[in-house]
Amino acid sequence: MSETPAQCSIKQERISYTPPESPVPSYASSTPLHVPVPRALRMEEDSIRLPAHLRLQPIYWSRDDVAQWLKWAENEFSLRPIDSNTFEMNGKALLLLTKEDFRYRSPHSGDVLYELLQHILKQRKPRILFSPFFHPGNSIHTQPEVILHQNHEEDNCVQRTPRPSVDNVHHNPPTIELLHRSRSPITTNHRPSPDPEQRPLRSPLDNMIRRLSPAERAQGPRPHQENNHQESYPLSVSPMENNHCPASSESHPKPSSPRQESTRVIQLMPSPIMHPLILNPRHSVDFKQSRLSEDGLHREGKPINLSHREDLAYMNHIMVSVSPPEEHAMPIGRIADCRLLWDYVYQLLSDSRYENFIRWEDKESKIFRIVDPNGLARLWGNHKNRTNMTYEKMSRALRHYYKLNIIRKEPGQRLLFRFMKTPDEIMSGRTDRLEHLESQELDEQIYQEDEC
């Protein structure tokens, strides 16, 4: 039986047609859902892949790390050979260099190295994903409040059928609640109560120790009417108020127990650097708990008024002063009783804080190297109150010492110099002439700047 042309075409279409893949993923498997990383973020991370030993913050790089980074950049970006001797410094000193400093040290590749370093600094900034979609077991909100829970069982209990009361008790670990609050340990946040008659009086303590239920956390963050300041971050460490999972249905809420427990609050004072609080499970924390009731607080059978409740809130606060680690201040280069440049250079060479600017290459032979010419010029400018001092201007003063055979430039070496005399020998000579030459040089610079 012959087929009509229309039937043949329909048959061919059926054979060649393949149904498209369903855009809806299958949830039959028990594997967790992986959210793909945005393409722009993935491209930014894949654009520069440093070696494993260089993936620390550049501020922690050693001198060898800086040399290896230069070698890697030279190969990665097909740059001209870079003289690593011009970058003999650690990561801290590398971050002090400006773009002009990079160009001065490496005329052909300095701008690329500077932009590469800035890109690495941006790439090393921590990224925080605030969406709870990435962590179904945790509840992470943005600015209003951040609540971190170490236990994932509580959220899973929402979907389970209720068990007998004996099985419903779970001894969960303490929760850590990090909230944005004002300077005062007593918060002024008052959420509207569903029934004002049942809740005649709500102290700030009740709002402060209030913990979100899993059903409330699933609804996302709520808008806050309070003023969120960044100066203070109260951190409350407390046991769970309710050690049982709520019922799976929200239409039958359980009445709250008549007795609740207050929390012990550890409040971190404002500090430039916030250190993490490490809770060691081996050392138990003794929380002195006071019993609260919904219809008015009672303690030993006597009612407690509002002032006592505020005192209770203050008693349950532990003020922890978090101070940043001691860091050496950036040297500004001012040295007392030091007028001449050669003496100033000797003083800097004797101080280890200035090794990123100038250092001894061979102390016995009195050979020194200027590591950061522009930085050294800025230090000399601060010392002489010349904010526009440059290395070119400072090198003019150095040339006077060439003529007097005090300092000599090493032949064939860049930024390498040698003292031809000891400080005692220099002081025994005519220092008044040196002072006159240097002051004359500064006066000429000021005159030229005024002319411009």
UniProtKB/Swiss-Prot annotation:
Ubiquitous. The record marks L54, R55 as: Breakpoint for translocation to form ETV6-MDS2 in MDS. The modification Phosphoserine is found at S22, S213, S238, S257, S323. The record marks R55, L56 as: Breakpoint for translocation to form PAX5-ETV6. The modification Phosphothreonine is found at T18. The record marks A336, D337 as: Breakpoint for translocation to form ETV6-AML1 in ALL. There is a cross-link at K11, K288, K302, K403, K421 (Glycyl lysine isopeptide (Lys-Gly) (interchain with G-Cter in SUMO2)). Changing R399C: In THC5; abrogates DNA binding; alters subcellular location; decreases transcriptional repression in a dominant-negative fashion. The record marks K11, Q12 as: Breakpoint for translocation to form CHIC2-ETV6 in AML. CDD domains: SAM_PNT-Tel_Yan (cd08535). Phosphorylation of Ser-257 by MAPK14 (p38) inhibits ETV6 transcriptional repression. The modification N6-acetyllysine is found at K11, K302. Residues 40-124 form the PNT domain. Belongs to the ETS family. Can form homodimers or heterodimers with TEL2 or FLI1. Interacts with L3MBTL1 and HDAC9. This is Transcription factor ETV6. It comes from Homo sapiens (Human). The gene is ETV6.
